[in-house]
Design a protein with these regions (language model features):
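A short, glycine-centered helix-capping/turn motif at helix boundaries
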Residues: 16-18, 76, 158, 188
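Double-stranded DNA-binding cores of transcription factors and transposases
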Residues: 1-36
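Conserved short loop/turn motifs at secondary-structure junctions
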Residues: 29-31, 69-70, 84-92, 168, ...
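RNase H-like DDE/DDD metal-dependent nuclease/strand-transfer catalytic core used by mobile genetic elements
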Residues: 91-110, 122-300, 365, 370-401
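Basic, flexible linker segments flanking DNA-binding modules
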Residues: 18, 40-135, 143, 226-228
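Protein C-terminal end segments and domain termini
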Residues: 300-401
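Amphipathic alpha-helical repeat elements characteristic of tetratricopeptide repeat
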Residues: 3-4, 60-64, 175
């Protein structure tokens, strides 16, 4: 998008009040067959070029955008996270009270449900982080584990900014290092302290964190701490949000397939199909949640993205100093004498040895199903499209054998 989009055109679209979704449609029409014009790409482009709405948003315009937001992210976003979501769509500077009123008008039943469950639970154990770059919390979420979906997230303890998430079939040392820790180190730098639970899936990440520990901002701190998962406070807060906004709606739809005997989780090909579709669907929800979370206002402090820019003390590290996955695995196994399990799928992909058939399956799935539509419907209580996609994936795989 950076090479093809005209910045003046994008600014003009925003000035006319077009959302990122609308701009994505326009650019896709201008450059048919060219990838890279998704709504998320447009969001990133606008953020990098400081392009956002500067004209007042009328109540009617706000109402329409909130209704679209509810359709996209479901019933659990309150005024703060919905304000964050609207910011990801280019709508800045809208008061929480206005967003709250629009939410109440857009979906009264959702508003009542949020109010009924809004009692806040106090955390009896004080939490402290000195700056962005002090504590990095990494944890896994397996609420969809029975369907071959595991989320891993990394959050900065000071700002609350989600700096990286990854979705994988099964938790795995190599995938967590490759898709979570290494991208964080390359993008932001090193944290003084990495905090994880006692799971063995973090061994490679801890090994590299320790090997790079001399390059941290504050080398007097322990480079990592392992504790009970329930005491990994910032990341545990995030999982509650993710479960409500992503995992539970997807799980509810898939549970129906199992209950109706339409999905056999003892059969390896079916396990692979449900994992493939559920992972891609949940990635849509995770992307929407992460963007909204990082733009939601924290009273008296600003958004996580803003706090990051004000107190960033993560230690920059040159890319060549961060080992590749292959280098990290070799170093770990040489130093410990252990062996790390390579990445693997949930269930059996019978087309794995045929790239042409794998590509054909992917193209057929994209042609027949839109992942954003699947997620939006599932999160609003209609899981039929997700169920159809799982069954279609299984039958399509069988037909390509």
């Amino acid at each position: 998008m950076e090479e093809l989009a005209d910045e003046d055109d994008v600014r003009a679209y925003i000035a006319q009040g077009f959302t990122h979704d609308k701009i994505s449609d326009l650019l896709t029409g201008q450059f048919p067959g060219v990838r890279g014009f998704s709504a998320r790409s447009v969001r990133r482009y606008c953020k990098e070029h400081d392009i956002h709405w500067t004209t007042p948003v009328t109540d009617d315009e706000l109402q329409r955008e909130v209704e679209k937001g509810v359709e996209a992210v479901g019933p659990t976003y309150g005024r703060k996270t919905m304000k964050g979501y609207l910011a990801t769509q280019g709508l800045y500077g809208i008061g929480e009270a206005r967003v709250g009123r629009a939410l109440k008008e857009a979906a009264p039943e959702y508003h009542q449900s949020r109010q009924a469950s809004a009692a806040r639970r106090a955390n009896p154990i004080p939490y402290y982080a000195e700056y962005f770059g002090h504590k990095l919390h990494i944890d896994q979420n397996e609420k969809l584990g029975m369907y071959g979906v595991t989320h891993v997230a990394a959050i900065d303890g000071y700002s609350g900014k989600l700096v990286q998430t990854a979705t994988m079939p099964l938790k795995n040392n190599q995938v967590i290092y490759r898709d979570v820790f290494r991208p964080v180190a390359l993008t932001y730098g090193l944290w003084d302290q990495l905090r994880v639970d006692h799971g063995s899936e973090f061994l490679l990440t801890l090994f590299v964190q320790e090997s790079l520990s001399a390059q941290r901002t504050n080398t007097s701190r322990e480079c990592y701490v392992q504790s009970d998962s329930r005491r990994n406070h910032p990341i545990e807060r995030i999982w509650g949000e993710v479960n409500q906004r992503v995992n539970y709606p997807i799980k509810a739809a898939l549970n129906i397939l199992v209950e109706q005997d339409a999905l056999d989780l003892t059969e390896e090909k079916s396990k692979f199909s449900v994992s493939s579709v559920a992972m891609e669907t949940s990635k849509v929800g995770m992307a929407r949640f992460v963007d909204s979370w990082n733009m939601h206002p924290i009273p008296g402090r600003g958004t996580p993205d803003f706090i990051w820019t004000q107190q960033n003390r993560a230690a920059p590290i040159p890319p060549y100093a961060v080992p590749s996955l292959h280098e990290a695995v070799l170093a770990y196994e040489a130093a410990t004498g252990g062996t790390l399990v390579p990445p693997h799928t949930f269930g059996l992909d019978v087309l794995a040895h045929s790239p042409a058939k794998t590509l054909e399956r992917e193209q057929q799935m994209r042609h027949n199903f839109n992942l954003e539509d699947i997620f939006s419907r599932a999160v609003n209580g209609d899981g039929t499209l997700l169920q159809q996609a799982v069954i279609y994936h299984r039958r399509l795989t069988e037909s390509l054998l």
